[in-house]
Amino acid sequence: MDPEALNLEFYDKNGLDNPIHFRCDPKRIGMTLPSPDFSVDDVLELVGGNRMIEVVQVQNQGSVKMSLQEFINFYKTPQEKREVLYNVLSLEFSQTPLEDLVKSPELVRQIDWVGNQWPDALRQRWISFNGRDKKFYNPHHTFPKVQNYCLMSVANCYTDFHIDFSGTSVWYHVLKGRKVFWLIPPTETNFFIYQEFIKTVNDNAFFGKSVEKCHVAILEPGDTMLIPSGWIHAVYTPDDSLVFGGNFLHSQSCKTQLRVYQVENKLNITRKFRLPYNEELIFYVIADYVKQWTGREYVRPLRIEDAKYDYVGDKWKTAGGHHKKIEYSDYETGVELTNDMIKGDEESTKDEVKVIAMHAENSLFGYPMVSKATFSADTGLEEEADEDEVKYQETKEEMDARRDAEIDELANSNSLIFYKNRTHDFVRNKCVPDHKLPIGHEPPIYFNDDEISRISPRLLDELETLGTYIRRKARVEVAEGICQPASLINTFQTVLKKRRSELTGKKFEFNQIMPRRYTRSTMETGEYDFQPTQEVPQESARRSTRFKVDNFPDELLESEVTDKPIILPQQPSSGPLEYLPAPKDEIKEDINGFEEEFEEEYEGIGQRDDQEEEEYDAEEPEDQEEEEEDEYQAEEYTPTPVTRRSSSRRSGAKNDESEEVSVKKDKKEKMEKVEKDEKRRNSKSKKDKISKEKKKKERERIELESQLDAELRAAHGGGSSKSKKKKPEKPAFVGGLPTSSIQIDPVVSNPYNYDPRMEMMKLGTGQLKSAYRKTKNNVELHIEKNLYKIEPKRGSEEGSQSREQSMEPEHSTPVFTTFDDINEANNDHYDGQKPPTKRAKYEAISVDTYETPSSSRNKEHKEYRPSPNAAPTPSPSHHQKPKLSSPAMVSSTNEYQLRKHMSSERRSSDAGSAMKKGVYMPAMSRQDKMIAEGASAPSSRHSSISSERRPSFIPDFNSSRNSSIDTPYTPTTVTPSRSSWLPNTSSINRHSIEDDSPIDVVNDSLSPINIASSPTYPTAITPPPVTLSDLKKDMSNGRKSHSQHHDDGHKHKIPSKEAIAELKLLVGKLKAINDS
């Protein structure tokens, strides 16, 4: 098309339905662009390198934030050195010096909603700084700022198929490089396919092959293209390019814009990728059209000094505010914004500092009388005022009150003003259903026929869709300054109906909305929604009338005496008034022509008057008019002190003066009765009030006393408050039997922390923590700890070294169990293996001399012994392999002692055993405990076969064994389960980590055992004899026992006879102590 033909006439006739490609001088379509020598370095200089921008990563279509300086450095790198591809699509350069060099086509500026309908005073922004030195900044705006974009793309960048946010149209000019566009029309089928394409994230297919038609357009340097609303397009960049463009909304594409907006809602597109303040913009557009068509103003003129953030409107640009660079030093003393102040605005990352601009030139253009206090308190702006110029300055409150009073006065005097003061504003970013509220009585609509006649059929269809969408929406975000959205939408749709009737040749019927129908009570109180004509009363006339008789029907009542002037509203009415005169049959009159009155009705006159006031104060919707009418007719008529009579055009001339005298007498009598009733009611109300006050004071006194009592009890450590009335104690009955009361608190204090539950549960076996837990501070007596001390303290350097050397993998399960073991494992009280608790610094000694020493890891486990009569039963998993018990010598005497003391019950703790015997046992060291236990078992290497999960030890098959036997020992069976405190040998590895046995008792009189000739399931099998010399050789080879804690790493080994004698001596001493 001809470039000069792109004007408003073409737009009104054809709209913007198809893409338009211009290959001509940009000035022919009203554009302003820089010279072809303009480069990205100029963009960097005009916009600023410290501006943070969002960059698209082409590989995954994700986004990355970086400064403009960083991207320019990437853009200038050679193509072969670019590891990733970055594409800048969201650099909005409005309010920067670059805006003076680039201007969109003239038609775009004329039809753009944001540029023409958005109020100038609401063009605001706030700046956020981030970085260590607050070097980088990011602007945030409170209006849809999408008019000017600078797009910088490197070669091979690709943007997949998409629709611009909220169905905005696009203007596009290529200054450098080339662009390839794939364009798909916005048909219903294509929209449906596109929605499915967006949902399939992993679909890498080319969307252009999924639709019927896909157009291709190649833009060379200097070309300009207009992309209409809703067109699905993809862009490829073959060369490094520099492009200028922008988005805009207009009236000829309302249908498509709303359809795209609904698609975004269905796809749950985030707020970040949508047009901000879309619904607020629609309200401003509708209000602008209504003002052109009817003269009604629904948007309150907003002031620049009321700006919550930094004003950046037209006056700010005229003053050159956009040429000043943004630096943190200029904003350092600004007002920091809270999250509540910016809640709901443009989403951004959490920045370190958020401030408002502090420059005086950024605000207050044409308002020199505003005080400095206003800036510091409201907007944070500072300005010095000349004393000679201004002597008195208003405060913020005074200025706001004066402004509100001016708006209220203007709204009352002008019937075309529908906005109100700032107290009626809606909360920003809050959806409200106020556009669906019922509309009360309004003044008539004055139509501007010249402007309405310019609405073309095409534009009418688009605007009707816009009005229907807003009306049907449940909740909307009402723009700031609009106080009556329901009336605004109703007027907008009324004008469109009028224009539709004109185009179709039908008669336009406009029904004015009435709040309610008028009844007698309305006429008596004077609550009119219209202004009736008035007549000046003449002094010689006996009666003054307020209305012309010809204007009202005969049934309407007139007042005889005008006591008070009726205040009427200032706005004229429109449309026919509807009256509901009462039928003559329902109005009963006496001989004088007055309605009958009854004295008993005066008793409830005050209540009925209050009800009538409440009913007429609130406006009722249209659909309740009939119900109200029935209610008013059903009520009995209640006369007022001023008498009324039925009107007639000749009724006043026929009455005599005698009638008036009788009426006056009746009036006086009734008034006196009314006054008496009022006095009686007043006196009664005073008495009620006095009684209520007394009750209230008494209640407050009781509450105060209860609070004081509670505070005193809390201060003195008392319990809850008790009732003063003592109830007789009665026995408690449960199931017909009296029971003793359950005592919650202890009778006496427990200074020794004695807990009888210790006798029932062994500490450390999984019970809950309590204040009675056994610790060294509350139950242990600190006796001499160095008794029989033959090892250093735990935690020493050598001890920690030995433990580190003994760290080995997790132990396996026991190789076999006995029949008794299986039975015990199936018992209900079997708890299984518990995690080890924290080891105390000092261990308590047990008085059970028959207890087998075990490692501290298994100290808390239940131990079981095999029955002497039951044969050992093999494990199910090892039924074909011979089972070996721990290699220990078990004599018949020892076995008898073990069988005598063993049971399947859970054994109590060491402290619990001592308590059962009535003896308090102090804490003793581990070696004392083992010495005491060793006395009851001469052969300490007995078998510890039990259902307890003890570790099994695997002999070392690769090592050689130095023994007194010529034939080497070679095990042929499963690894035997042996005690962890046995001495170390060359054929058996040590696996226990927690055992720290101080003494190894070695039996030198052992004889070798032939394992091959042993029974299949032996009770006890011992390895070849081990001598002290063999042990010394083993220790010299570096295999140290993990339980050695002295300096040289070797244990002092003594013969078994001496050890047993020593143990017996200790046991005797312990028995003596117990007996004493």
From Swiss-Prot:
Kindly state one GO CC term assigned in the UniProt record. nucleus
**Matches recorded under PROSITE patterns:** JMJC
Molecular function per GO: histone demethylase activity; histone H3K36me/H3K36me2 demethylase activity; metal ion binding; transcription coregulator activity
**UniProt binding sites for substrate:** 159, 179
The reply on keyword Transcription regulation is yes
Q: In which compartments does the protein localize?
A: Nucleus
Task: Specify where it is mainly localized.
Answer: nucleus
Description of the deletion phenotype: RNAi-mediated knockdown introduced at L1 and young adult stages increases lifespan by 12% and 15% respectively.
Q: Where is the composition biased (Polar residues)?
A: 957-990, 1004-1019
| Cofactor(s) the protein requires to work | Fe(2+)
**Cofactor comment text:** Binds 1 Fe(2+) ion per subunit.
Instruction: State the source organism's domain of life.
Output: Eukaryota
> Basic and acidic residues bias located where?
653-680, 699-714, 789-811, 1044-1056
Which amino acid positions bind Fe cation, per UniProt? 162, 164, 233
Stretches for region Disordered: 598-748, 789-1056
The JmjC domain is annotated at: 93-265
EC number(s) recorded for this UniProt protein: 1.14.11.27
Biased composition regions of type Low complexity, renumbered to the chain = 935-946
Ordered alphabetically, the record's keywords are: Chromatin regulator, Dioxygenase, Iron, Metal-binding, Nucleus, Oxidoreductase, Transcription, Transcription regulation
- One biological-process term from Gene Ontology? regulation of transcription by RNA polymerase II
Q: What is known about what this protein does?
A: Histone demethylase that specifically demethylates 'Lys-36' of histone H3, thereby playing a central role in histone code. Has a role in regulating lifespan.
What the entry says about domains is: The JmjC domain mediates the demethylation activity.
Identify this protein by name.
JmjC domain-containing histone demethylation protein 1
Provenance organism: Caenorhabditis elegans
